[in-house]
From Swiss-Prot:
Keyword Signal appears in the UniProt entry: yes
Keyword hit for Signal: yes
Valine amide modifications at: V155
Region (Disordered) location: 28-80, 156-175
GO process terms (BP): neuropeptide signaling pathway; positive regulation of hindgut contraction; tachykinin receptor signaling pathway
Signal sequence coordinates: 1-24
Compositionally biased residues, Basic and acidic residues: 62-72
Source species: Drosophila pseudoobscura pseudoobscura (Fruit fly)
Location relative to the cell: Secreted
Protein name (record): Tachykinins
Length: 289
């Protein structure tokens, strides 16, 4: 009897312990159901906390891309209702999740990135600057008119200190005309140099209009640097004079002798260019020096 009574007491104690454990387990699901991380069923409502991740702000409806492709059980992805009216073969359907992601540097809920200078702002600043320059020019003109300056409105047509542009300006008329003239004379460009687009060469060596001495002897220059032909135009296409007919061989090949003996160009007194190319179609003979 004692053994049966002890067994009954142990069985009763175990039954009480199991009942208490079952009661405590029934009370816990109400607390943990709101923070459960298990995916809900197909008919269960979505209980996802739509907060931005801690790495960066991606917008109100933006979500990070999930590297794993789980279209059926991806409860972290976008709502299936967003793509319900699209075909599965469309490009946007394939890249819909990627295209609807907010950029990593998204500023604000529906805002855009900050642009420091816009086109409208630059146009406004440009107009303000032009208006300020006009006011300064008008103010300067009025001050000069009030001071009685007669030179207002005069257009100078010569550069006061040498060549200062394509069509230089004259020095302003005043008491320093002589000084300006001397300054212009001293600031001339050197001999045989270009004085601008509309300028001319210095007149001190006008009779030396030949190419300078160089190793290449230029294509249209002459070999001698300071040979003076009295400003005559020496031809290249001149003809032989009748007095030099005796130099021919007599058999009608007088013109061919220059092909065999080209030095006759230098020795013969004819209308050929004595030393290189010195013209194109002139007719005047070269004067003997």
């Amino acid at each position: 009897m004692r053994s049966q009574g002890g067994s009954f007491a142990v069985a009763l104690l175990l039954l009480l312990l199991l009942t208490a454990a079952a009661t405590a387990a029934d009370a816990e699901p109400d607390v943990e159901s709101s923070v459960s991380t298990l995916p809900p069923g197909a008919d269960a409502p979505r209980r996802m906390v739509k907060r931005a991740p801690t790495s960066s702000f991606i917008g109100m409806r933006g979500k990070k891309e999930d590297e794993k492709d789980q279209r059926a059980a991806d409860w972290m992805g976008p709502d299936p209702l967003d793509y319900a009216d699209m075909d599965e073969d469309s490009i946007y359907y394939e890249n819909g999740k990627r295209l609807k992601k907010a950029p990593m540097s998204f500023v604000g809920m529906r805002g855009k990135k900050y642009i420091p200078i816009s086109n409208r702002l630059s146009d406004v600043l440009h107009q303000i600057e032009e208006q300020r320059m006009r006011e300064n020019l008008l103010e300067d003109l009025f001050e000069r008119l009030a001071a009685g300056d007669d030179s207002v409105g005069d257009v100078g047509k010569r550069a006061p200190t040498g060549f200062t542009g394509m069509r230089g300006k004259r020095p302003m008329s005043g008491d320093d005309d002589d000084n300006d003239a001397m300054e212009l004379l001293q600031k001339r460009a050197p001999v045989n140099s270009f004085l601008g687009v509309r300028g001319k060469k210095d007149v001190s060596h006008q009779h030396y209009k030949r190419a300078a001495l160089s190793e290449a002897y230029d294509v249209r220059g002459k070999k001698e640097r300071y040979a003076d032909f009295n400003s005559k135009f020496v031809a290249v296409r001149g003809k032989k004079s009748e007095q030099e007919a005796g130099l021919d061989t007599g058999d009608g090949d007088g013109d061919q002798q220059y092909l065999v003996r080209p030095w006759l160009y230098l020795w013969a007194d004819n209308k050929r260019a004595p030393s290189g190319f010195q013209g194109m179609r002139g007719k005047r003979p070269a004067l003997a020096e």
